[in-house]
Amino acid sequence: MHRIPSSSAALVVIGLLAAACSSTNEHAADLVFRGGTVWTGDSLQPEARAVAIRKDRIVYVGDENGVDSLIGASTRVVTLGNRLLMPGFVDTHVHPVSAGVQLGECNLADIATIERLREVVAECNARDPNASWIRGGGFALPLFAGGTPTAALLDSLVPGRPAFLSSADGHNGWANSRALAIAGITRDTRDPVNGVIVRDAQGNAVGTLRESAQELVQQHIPPHTREEMRVGLERAVRRANQLGITSWHEASATEEILRAYTDADSLGRLTVRTVVALHVNVDSGPEQVQGLAALRDRYARPMVRPVAAKIFADGVLEGGTAALLADYTDRPGFRGDLNLPPARFNAIARALDSAGFKIHVHAIGDRAIRASLDAIEQRHGSRRVSGGPRPMIVHIQLFDSTDIGRFASLGVVASWQALWAFRDTYMKELTEPRIGPTRARWQYPLATMARTGAIMAGGSDWFVSSLDPLQAIRVAVTRQSPDDSTDAPFFPEERVDVETMLKAYTLGGAMASDAEQELGTIAVGKLADVIVLSADLRKVSPYQVTRTPVVLTVLGGREVWRDSTAFK
C-alpha cells in the first residue's frame, strides 16, 4: 500500500458543440449525444453512435438515424466528434469526508522533499496562530528514514503548541512532544492492541504512532464541527464530479460522517451516489451489528446507502503491520498480526451477513486476504455468493497465488487500488525489503485475477492516493509511474488492457454496489450517469490516458460538471 500525489494539472481546453433542434415532439428527450463514439460497457451492445436521455433515465442507445425522432425544440444536442461518451466512474474505496476536510487543513500531499515539507509545516504553524492544535496530513512516509518521522523535527517546526499529522496512508501519525505529553505517552506506556508506539533504544516514544496507537493522541484533538465535515465533503464532491466520478463507496463511516452526507444531500449538494461502509470495531464482537443496522435505517435515503460494513483485517506492509503467511524478510520470527482473531472475524461476518450488510474488508497481507476469504466462505460454503450483497475485499496487495481463484468461486469483488502497482519509493524502500523478491511478484496480480473471471472494481483510497481514475488506469495498463514512462514496468506480466480497467471502474463498480440493474453501463432504462472524455481512451497511447480528461459529467440526466470552455 502506498501513496501517489494527486494530479494538480489543469484540464486541457476542449470544445463541444451544442445545438437545439426546432422540431416538436411530446416524447422528446431532454439531452441527446450524437456524432461520436459511445462506449456502453454493455456486452450486448458494446458501442453506439447516439444516446438520448429523458429526465434521469436513458431512453435510447443506437445509431444516429434512430435518435432523430427524439429531438424536440427544447432538446439539448451535444455533438461528440472525436470524444468518447461512457458510463460514469465508480470509486469503490474512498474517504471523501476526511479527504475534503484535510484539504482545508495542513495539507502535506504532493510534497516530494523533506525540505519542502519543513517549509509547508512551518507555514501552517504561522498561518493560524490562534489554533489550539496544528493538524492535517498527507505526507509520504519514505521522506523519513525507515518511515519514522520524529517529534524532535516537528518540535522545531511547531514549537509552542501540540501538532499531529497523519501520513498519506492513514496508518501512521506524527506527533510533536507537546502532543505526546498531552496524551500522557511515556516510556512506561504500553502499546495498545493493534498499535505501535515507535521507540528509541531507551524506550522513549520518538514521535511516530502506528495504527491504533494514533488514537492515543487523536482522542485529545478537538473534533471537527458538523459544518466543517459537510463543507469538507462538498469540496470532495466537486473534485469527484470534475474527474467523472458519479458513484463512490465511503470506506469507513461513523455517525458524524453519515450526518455530513445527509446534510449535504438535504442542501442539494451531494452529486455523487454514495454507498457507505459503516465502521466495525474489531475489538468488539457481533453484538455491535444491531447498532450498525439502526444507523443504516436512520440515515438511508436515495443518494446515501449505508448498506456496507468495513472490517480492518490488518494494517500495511510499509509499517510492518500487514498480516503475512511467512515471516517478514527484515524481521525473522515476525509475521504481523490480524486485527482480530479468526473466530471473532467469522462471527462478525456471519452477523453482518444475516443483517443484510455488504462486507467490505481491508486486507493487505496474504494472511489477511486468506482470513477474509475464509470468513466469507464459512458463511456461504465454497460456492459463489448469490442473492444478497456481494462481499468486497479492498487493497489486496500481497497474495498467496492459491487464493486468487477464490474471488471468482466465492463471488467476492476484488477492489484494486491499481495506482499502487509500480515501483515508487514506497515499494523500493519500505515494502520490497520487508517481503523479498519472491513474494514481491505476487503484489497486485491484476491480469491473473482478470483471467479467473472475478468481478474487478477500481478504487482510489483518496486521500491516501490520487482520486483520478485515469491515473489508476494508466498504471494498471503500463505497470509504470503515472508520471514517468521510462521506469521499468513492475512485473509487466500483470498488465491489463484499457477496456478491462474501464469495466472495473464502471460495471465492476456497479456490481460492487449491487446496483448493476441501474448503473454501470449505458443501456435503455438505466440511470443517466454518463461522462464525456476528450478522446477515446482505447485508441490513445497508454501514456496519454492521463492527458485525456473528463470534460462533462452528467448525474441522473443533470449536468454536474463541465470544462469551462466546453460549450461556447
Question: Can you describe what each PLM-predicted range is?
Answer:
Residues D265-G268, A294-V304, F407-S409:
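Acidic (Asp/Glu)-rich catalytic clusters
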Residues N241, A300, D353, A408, ...:
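Anion (oxyanion) recognition and catalysis
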Residues R350-H360, R367-P391, I396, S401-G405, ...:
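His/Asp/Glu-enriched, well-ordered alpha-helical/loop segment
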Residues V413:
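Ligand-binding beta-strand-loop-alpha-helix segment within the catalytic cores
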Residues S8-A19:
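Bacterial N-terminal signal peptides
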Residues M1-P5:
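N-terminal secretory signal peptides that target proteins for export/translocation
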